[in-house]
Design a protein with these regions (language model features):
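Catalytic core of pol beta-like nucleotidyltransferases
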Residues: 1-29, 38-43, 54-140
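Glycine-rich beta-strand-to-loop/alpha-helix junction loops that act as flexible
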Residues: 33-35
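Short hydrophobic/aromatic beta-strand micro-patches
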Residues: 50-52
Length: 140
């Protein structure tokens, strides 16, 4: 097995474990983003996931870090409530833009389509373009 294929197989196994562990949180969508979504991952890359679910900790820091999910090797997961993530988009927080622009939904109940639609509307309305190291807003 080639190194990239091995890493991809390990990532699929880790993501599967996260999906199982996330079930009590009632996930609406789980989005793979970062180097594994782009395909430019290496041996030292983390597996970046955004977990948007109905049952999240009340504390914002606990939602972002989801300590119980961080025990899975190489997985870095950030949690959001559905309305909270949509608000991040509307507030034009570029982390949310990165997640949607390069993200691949791993599981979804239809929420991702709503998120993607909101993202596409903002990109059109504000003339937003992705740059190699950030974003440009042409029409504030």
């Amino acid at each position: 097995m080639l190194p990239k294929e091995r890493l991809r197989a390990e990532a699929q196994e880790a993501v599967g474990l996260l999906v199982e562990r996330a079930k009590p949180l009632k996930p609406r969508t789980i989005i793979l983003f970062g180097s594994y979504a782009r395909g430019d991952f290496t041996e030292s890359s983390d597996i970046d996931l955004c977990l948007i679910a109905d049952r999240m900790p009340d504390d914002e820091f606990a939602r972002r870090t989801l300590p119980d999910m961080q025990e899975i090797p190489k997985v870095r997961v950030m949690g959001f409530l559905p309305d909270e993530f949509l608000e991040y988009l509307r507030d034009m927080r570029f982390l949310a833009f990165d997640i949607v622009a390069e993200g691949i939904p791993i599981c979804d109940d239809g929420l991702y389509r709503k998120i993607r639609g909101a993202f596409d509307d903002l990109v059109q309305k504000h003339g937003i373009t992705k740059l190699p190291h950030g974003w440009r807003i042409s029409k504030p």
